[in-house]
Swiss-Prot record:
The keyword Cytoplasm applies. It is found in: Nucleus; Cytoplasm. GO terms for biological process: flagellated sperm motility; lncRNA transcription; mRNA splice site recognition; nuclear body organization; positive regulation of mRNA splicing, via spliceosome; regulation of alternative mRNA splicing, via spliceosome; RNA splicing; spermatogenesis. Keywords: Activator, Cytoplasm, mRNA processing, mRNA splicing, Nucleus, Repeat, RNA-binding. PANTHER family: RNA BINDING PROTEIN. Signal peptide: none annotated. This is CUGBP Elav-like family member 3. Pfam families: RRM_1. One of its GO terms (molecular function) is mRNA binding.
Length: 465
């Protein structure tokens, strides 16, 4: 019989030729097995290299996890076996609590006495720094989920301990998956400071921040048509916000109206700015002799308009706004590559077209796949090992796009099972972006995996990747 609190284990990194009868001798030494099932693809029936294991006794599962997880490598495998509670063993089975807002003077014994009335405590540890000083928080593990839940219901926010700045916090400790997601969110926020979009503007960051704010205001007025531009403006503002948080922008910029000039650049004539902005080998577009006002005033969208038509002819406001951005699209192709191709002319309201025939769809998919697999110049292509199984092309693109313009991002997939092989390539258009990505992401931990990020060796190198 299975105990009520028995744990269902996930077993990974097992050879695909091993079935249940082959795996049982490995796990039976730790206790009687209630159920062992190899996971197979529901469509192809192929072995997926993992299994679910449930012992009759909870202690047997804990012993197996302690003895095998990351400790033993099965024949034919490159990585050690994974033995850990399955995802289905979710918060309902948790017994470990996080306790916050403790007083700095409270010891392990003080915390244990506080929680002992609710049940049997397996572990109680106050977290401390290298110097032994309490961090004001602790972990407490009960024998059952019910005991842990009772402690939460009674103690959370019930009192403020001496030396604490707020009421007591008692909650279930984060799972490994939740910690991994939080780390990804933190790095996504921090990576903005590496963006070449922000760094290449240098001393004119105040000008560009004002420009992007005005662009955001412009696209908000035409949100029905310009959602990709709104997205790009939001991304750019996030990059600038990340730099501001690191002290690289000294002067805050407030949103300006269509007739005012941002305070941070009021003393600098715009005529002096394009000369410095002519970077990457591009020269600024000269103003046209069509009766334009003096260049020391900003226009409502933050840039000089360059209309394609005579001023006497009626000009669509949306077309004029786009024309005013063409100068910056030319000067910064990496920054606006997601925006410029989308609006070569104002979008027209047309009836929805029927989907293309299957043959045309297949050709389009092949073209997209070929485009995704393009590589950059030597020194611009990086290889990423140890990706999480669930990561797709879009996830690694989102992870690495803050470092620069990404030409392609590809996760390699097993053709037989359609499962990720847990490695992939990302190609940039310049070596500096690739090096910044390697320095920031090599060794970055997601869940129980640490990414290995390195340069892809040139094609003529006679060495394996």
């Amino acid at each position: 019989m299975k105990e009520p609190d028995a744990i269902k284990l996930f077993v990974g990194q097992i050879p695909r030729h091993l079935e249940e009868k082959d795996l049982k001798p490995i796990f039976e030494q730790f206790g009687r097995i209630f159920e062992l099932t190899v996971i197979k693809d529901k469509y192809t029936g192929l072995h997926k290299g993992c299994a679910f294991l449930t012992y009759c006794a909870r202690d047997s599962a804990l012993k197996a996890q302690s003895a095998l997880h990351e400790q033993k490598t099965l024949p034919g495998m490159n990585r050690p076996i994974q033995v850990k509670p399955a995802d289905s063993e979710s918060r309902g089975e948790d017994r470990k609590l996080f306790v916050g807002m403790l007083g700095k003077q409270q010891t392990d014994e003080d915390v244990r006495k506080m929680f002992e009335p609710f049940g049997t405590i397996d572990e109680c540890t106050v977290l401390r720094g290298p110097d032994g000083t309490s961090k004001g928080c602790a972990f407490v593990k009960f024998q059952t989920h019910a005991e842990a839940q009772a402690a939460i219901n009674t103690l959370h926010s019930s009192r403020t301990l001496p030396g604490a700045s707020s009421s007591l916090v008692v909650k279930f400790a984060d799972t490994e998956k939740e910690r991994g997601l939080r780390r990804m969110q933190q790095v996504a926020t921090q990576l903005g400071m590496f963006s070449p979009i922000a760094l290449q503007f240098g001393a004119y960051s105040a000008y560009t921040q004002a420009l992007m704010q005005q662009q955001a205001a412009l696209v908000a007025a035409h949100s029905a048509y310009l959602s990709p531009m709104a997205t790009m403006a939001a991304v750019q503002m996030q990059h600038m916000a990340a730099i501001n948080a690191n002290g690289l922008i000294a002067t805050p910029i407030t949103p300006s109206s269509g007739t005012s000039t941002p305070p941070a650049i009021a003393a600098t004539p715009v005529s002096a700015i394009p000369a410095a902005l002519g970077v990457n080998g591009y020269s600024p577009v000269p103003t046209q002799p069509t009766g334009q006002p003096a260049p020391d005033a900003l226009y409502p969208n933050g840039v000089h308009p360059y209309p394609a038509q005579s001023p006497a002819a009626p000009v669509d406001p949306l077309q004029q706004a786009y024309a005013g951005m063409q100068h910056y699209t030319a000067a910064y192709p990496a920054a606006y590559s997601l925006v410029a191709p989308a609006f070569p002319q104002p979008p027209a309201l047309v009836a929805q077209q029927p989907p293309p025939p299957p043959q045309q769809q297949q050709q389009q998919q092949q073209q997209q796949q070929q485009q995704q697999q393009r590589e950059g110049p030597d020194g611009c292509n990086i290889f990423i090992y140890h990706l999480p199984q669930e990561f797709t092309d879009s996830e690694i693109l989102q992870m690495f796009v803050p470092f620069g313009h990404v030409i392609s991002a590809k996760v390699f997939v097993d053709r037989a099972t359609n499962q990720s092989k847990c490695f992939g390539f990302v190609s940039f258009d310049n070596p500096a972006s690739a090096q910044a990505a390697i320095q920031a992401m090599n060794g970055f931990q997601i869940g129980m995996k640490r990414l290995k990020v390195q340069l892809k060796r040139p094609k003529d190198a006679n060495r394996p990747y």
